[in-house]
């Protein structure tokens, strides 16, 4: 069935209509209430006249349409207070301006100390009494404007002590000859943290804690046989565990011992590498609101996380009008990383079922036992770190925030209120039923200052098709009054793409997270896919076949395994066998066919090259509604034919469309055989 659809452009007419829309429907609603109260007979006569039903329907449409683009559909923006460059007139101009161009909320980010660079004479120093007056005024004004607000979380604070900060494993090595008694050998202390900076190995007085020491036999005259396994254990000579001798740290009788780094020992004949291993602070720092510079908090310590929250964010939320703050925003990219911390060895043993300490040299790149054992220990360490960050930091911080009636937003972490950041976050949001999915957009120099809406629209469209349905901009873009049309377009797109749930046919499982070629299963093949993790795979709910349901109630038709099953763990293999018995389609070998029709799964959408799409399914009392968002990624006008696989009575829906250069279109289909098409032309250059 072919439909040559009439295109409805979202442009100047819609913008002008929106400007007086709220006043219009409120006025009409007031008239109806007035007549119903003071002139019931007239309103009864009015209602009995069938010709008036069109008026009533129009009024209802006005009310529904005016309420359609709620705050959830509107984009947000970062609001940076840099170098203390803030004043009451500036706050008023920024907030009212951002509200007027259609922003749904702001992320307040005081960054960079005023002393670093003076932007203008009337600036205020961060955390000074005048600064708090500015903060209170911004809360008050945002509250009066009914503007949503979030606060940026920087987990650094002057109150964080070195032993409460992020930790890392450090070590020194010493080469010795065995076969004789070793007396008074100094095993130098590894690097340590002192007074805001890292000290080199051998320095004393800094923060450092020993974990264990080892004597490791090696072959050759100049160095260890394993040649350091940090690149690939598979290409290294593994060290048998019988050639690894633990050295008791505070005395002890395992072939002698070591006290304060001084070794008293006798080793068997041969060449030995002595490893002294411990942990210290990573030295990673951040400033609280641009001034309170301090160490980053240990992500494995709930007590340290609570100390951070109670010392800064809880008092902030208790300020006058502090309830206008509805979100706390965490940016994990700012952290660096840690591989040790509070109770890490104990947590590892409880979770992985064996003691990490005998295998600690693995963290120094020593391939113990075998290449496969080395990789297993490394994977277990990474998994433990992942679990601890999620449970001890994010879940603790989220619980503390919820006690203050505040939600948490962060980048690319699966179990938060609003996950953020591109494809991994899109997949995690689908798996765990989170909506909306945020992405920071156009914050670089190109996007923030040199990019016009005409240049930015193709990039925005591409990420809408990827699955992002709420953008966060830099306020350099949105402070301009001319930004309203662009923001209205984004709001309309986000309004439709936040409805229902995504239609994704394929789940791709890769033990390490991302497959090497993550574009392999996207358009133009006509299918969407999600990356699923081990947690999601093991929780796969196969309540009915042949579709599979994951924890977020997301349907998948096919499970792709991106590496040979022989390399998977026994736990994963058992789960895959269980899924096969339930009829789930599992493909674990290279697949050469152009589609999955042989499994009864036709392409969701068939499009020409250089186009992409997003598909949302809305289940209503009257049936289903399929919302398709199509984008033209070429700088030329195109006449295309799009073919849709729908759940309607039709087998396929074929639509002919005329798309302008970098144009986009919504095609909305329902099981009532209705079709609505909403298109946008290429935005003109200013």
Outline where the language-model segments fall.
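Mature N-terminal segment immediately following signal peptide/propeptide cleavage
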Residues: 69-97, 101-105
